């Protein structure tokens, strides 16, 4: 398989979209297949950035010594040394991009809409002032709001500051004095954030807890940071791999970001791999039309089966199609290639190292019979 081929205008292809979707419930082989394709792409010269919210790839340097020198694992914990590392003003290279992301994150956390004529202009003005200052950080936005002094500005400052009480939130807020930033110089870069609390799949945005809001906000920051990665050397094929993508595809800012990543990827020889549970997560028409390769693993839910078949452009009411998806074995998936062909594909580990290195099952205690 050549994941970079779609953009080359190959005769007979029905898509030039580089991005891919990996769909399926837990335990069907979705993560294994995704990891294997990324690994081989890197082995053959691609560069990759994996957003790993469940921190399942921390073992890769140990388990894959042949490429260990080209693996960069960034593990962001709530330790003091990581303070502010995910602040938009720290993580983004261009001040304008940092400003845009700061607005997105602060409106996401506070629920202030751009259509709110009372609160939004005050927040926008404070962010712009910080962007034009020498000292930039989200804590500086709080300071700027307090300087303005109006009851509304102070209320917004109090609201934002209430999020900083969580140790976990220290990653998002800097005082403008942070100098170090995340480096993506290696061929295979993995960003992990410890203690993320992702909302359950069916949880609506209005029901998010504070920890869930902060967790999704951090994923949005990291995924936006991926834009900088995409805009590197156009001659090198790149992959941005978004594990648990459903967690931010379910919020407006996340959907906008996903479309932005895919569009930038098309122009910059980069693929975005969405690893998610349901086809409905990628139902947005503009996003769906920019996904070339599709992989669907076993599902037993008839509603989900029909949505997946529809996503593949197949008849969702055809019982043969439904049965095929329902009866897939572990490691098997329904795949659609760049020529529009659909068929069942089996992913074989070939080497035991892959089976062990990509294993996401929790370890069992010694002596426990299986």
Spans of features found by a protein language model:
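P-loop NTPase motor core of the ASCE superfamily
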Residues: 95-136, 283-370
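Pre-Walker A segment
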Residues: 1-3
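Beta-sheet entry/capping signal
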Residues: 45-49, 70-74, 187-188, 237-239, ...
